[in-house]
């Protein structure tokens, strides 16, 4: 079962945050890294982003993003390779640090956007000189998988 079929804590929290605080993406070009089913990308577009690119290496994930964009009547763009992506105004990444091997992306993101937002429920505080923890929010995976309470707090990080 692909992970992205669920609305995990961080993606849900980031989508809610974008809809509540649309000024972070309004009129900007946004890339949603590890887009999964497109929840964060769709929220960014609904929040007023000029363009939103769903980036995921899984072709079935990108197809899911396409279907969900149609269901939500939003226009998105799609990429299966971060390294073929253009420079964007904002890069969003939710639920991508669950594997410590993915931490190198924190540096890679900076090659594509000066403003990067990371939301993660598994990493409570990572030490990186280019990022700062700025917020913490509660969320529940949907459907509720009865996961440990420790994962229900999502940490938000932003580039300095």
Residue ranges and their predicted role:
Residues 1-160:
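S-adenosylmethionine-dependent methyltransferases
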């Amino acid at each position: 079962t692909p992970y992205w079929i669920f609305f995990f804590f961080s993606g849900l929290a980031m989508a809610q945050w974008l809809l509540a605080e649309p000024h972070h993406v309004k009129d900007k070009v946004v890339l949603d890294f590890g887009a999964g089913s497109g929840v964060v990308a769709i929220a960014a577009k609904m929040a007023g982003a000029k363009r939103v690119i769903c980036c995921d290496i899984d072709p079935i994930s990108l197809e899911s993003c396409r279907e969900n964009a149609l269901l939500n009547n939003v226009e998105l763009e799609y990429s299966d390779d971060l390294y073929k992506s253009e420079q964007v105004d904002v890069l969003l990444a939710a639920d991508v640090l669950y594997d410590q091997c993915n931490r190198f992306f924190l540096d890679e993101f900076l090659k594509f956007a000066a403003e990067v937002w990371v939301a993660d429920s598994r990493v409570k505080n990572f030490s990186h000189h280019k990022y700062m923890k700025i917020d913490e929010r509660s969320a529940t995976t949907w459907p509720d998988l009865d996961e440990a309470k420790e994962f229900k707090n999502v940490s938000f990080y932003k580039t300095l």
